[in-house]
Amino acid sequence: MSENLFGLTVATDKGLDDLQCQRLLSENRRYQEVMLQYRCALKALESRLEILNEEFSLQHDRNPIESMKSRLKSPSSIMNKMHKRGLPLDFPTMQANIMDIAGVRVICSFEEDVFFLAKCLKEQSDIEIVTEKDYISRPKPNGYRSLHLTIRLPVFFAEKEIHVPVEIQLRTIAMDFLASLEHTIRYKKNLPINAEIETELKECADSSREWDGKMERLLHLMR
């Protein structure tokens, strides 16, 4: 069986892995042009966050950002997501519907830093907020906490300006630690999650929330 993948006719009887997709698309100029937009959007967003971090550090003698990590979705991950949603595999559809091709995870020291950075980004006049999901104020049933923003920000090229979507996850060190371990347990170990494991994970999530609360109170006491 053959299928049109972003302008390429490809045999897909046995499926495609990341390496095969990358090889196929590496010579596709349109794919390279589109992914350049997302890479540049990540650089532009990271630059804005670094500026906010430096300004805050100068004013308050501490950094709100502990670390940042950016990523681009792999070709096969994009294709799988489009397949699941029944979308045609073409670039206009991808750009209009897949909002998390580019992503940045921002790890903060304290909960208040998360909301401070989100507020600063939302107040920048050329950033459009597409979606906002506050899992800190309203955690998921399993205890997961994080603040998710999907934004569009302008990227300036020699002859054009393009507004590119980027997903941002803002969380504290405790939130990130728990989310990373839970991801390992749930998805990488391929183990069935029973009620006992669910209960233990929820208790860990509650403990991490208490930890963040205590650290926030300590921060206020030291001011």
What are these regions (language model features)?
Residues 42, 46, 50, 79, ...:
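Generic solvent-exposed, charged/amphipathic alpha-helical segments
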Residues 2-42, 46-55, 166-223:
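An acidic, glycine-/histidine-flanked metal-binding catalytic module
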Residues 50, 83-87, 122, 126:
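Generic short alpha-helical segment signal, independent of protein family or function
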Residues 34, 38, 42, 75, ...:
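Generic alpha-helical secondary structure
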Residues 102-107:
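Terminal, regulation- and interaction-focused segments at domain boundaries
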Residues 95, 108-215:
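Long beta-strand-rich cores associated with HINT superfamily self-processing modules
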Residues 55, 60-101:
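A glycine-rich, hydrophobic loop/mini-helix early in the fold
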Residues 41, 98-100, 143:
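Solvent-exposed loop and beta-edge segments used for protein-protein assembly and interaction
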